[in-house]
Amino acid sequence: MDIKVNTRPAGPKAHAVEVQGEIDVYTSPRVKETINELIDQGRYNLVIDLEGVRYIDSTGLGVLIGALKKVREHEG
């Protein structure tokens, strides 16, 4: 499975996580790692760009929901 995950600034206080490919049980750890790195750096205002995602399974959805819960704890 091929996936690309990139980050970039998306405004003065926000960062975008651009994902391309398929998010499944094999690729979701990469997405989770990227998001968690931003959260660990204190970046809580995230935009997750899924325009390039062709498929997402329940594992991928779980990663996104987990990230949402983490950033909401910090009013992100």
PLM region spans:
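STAS-typified acidic loop motif
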Residues: 4-33
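Amphipathic alpha-helical interaction surfaces in cytosolic regulatory modules
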Residues: 22-76
